[in-house]
A protein has these predicted regions:
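S-adenosylmethionine
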Residues: 2-167
Length: 167
């Protein structure tokens, strides 16, 4: 029953912490939302659903592979107000400046918040890698902040518990 509902696009599997992003953002019908690191699209789909099909969720990610993941979920769920495109979040998109009611930046991180599910993380993240991640996060946030229109919202999110990833 669960598998059938998932395949038909009636349900979307999402971690509680990911789900909270859309709840905090609370987009309204007609809003324009940009999700800068969107793959595989769960937050974008949730935002579009909360908007009841009105407005647009612009789900972006760095590669065609990641955008394909988003598009598969858009098609599976028949989401009419979510669109996906390749856009490197570290490169400023002048066409999006001051346009978005909500910008979601669920940036790459060390992953310490999901270490229980992915124990190999503790062997993969070095102090140097951590420093590189923080620089990447700050670059993405700097770009994303420019897309928020006056009185809009920028939602910063990571799946980590590392202080460096959250400051």
């Amino acid at each position: 029953l669960f598998r059938s509902a998932f395949i038909r696009g009636k349900i979307q599997v999402q971690d509680v912490s990911s789900m909270l992003v859309a709840e905090v953002a609370d987009p309204k019908k007609g809003d324009y939302v940009i999700d800068v690191c969107a793959a595989p699209g769960g937050k974008s789909l949730h935002m579009g659903d909360k908007m009841e099909g009105y407005g647009t969720v612009d789900a972006r990610d760095v590669s065609q592979y990641k955008v394909n993941l988003i598009e598969e979920n858009i098609q599976r769920t028949n989401s009419i107000n979510v669109q996906a495109r390749v856009q490197d979040a570290t490169i400023f998109d002048q066409d999006s400046e001051l346009l978005a009611d909500v910008v979601i930046a669920d940036v790459p991180c060390s992953g310490y918040g999901v270490i229980g599910k992915k124990p190999e993380i503790k062997y993969r993240v070095t102090p140097q890698k951590q420093d590189e991640i923080v620089i990447l996060q700050r670059t993405i946030l700097d770009r994303a902040a420019n897309y928020v229109k006056p009185r809009g919202e920028l939602i910063f999110s990571t799946c980590t518990i590392a202080k460096e990833d959250r400051s």
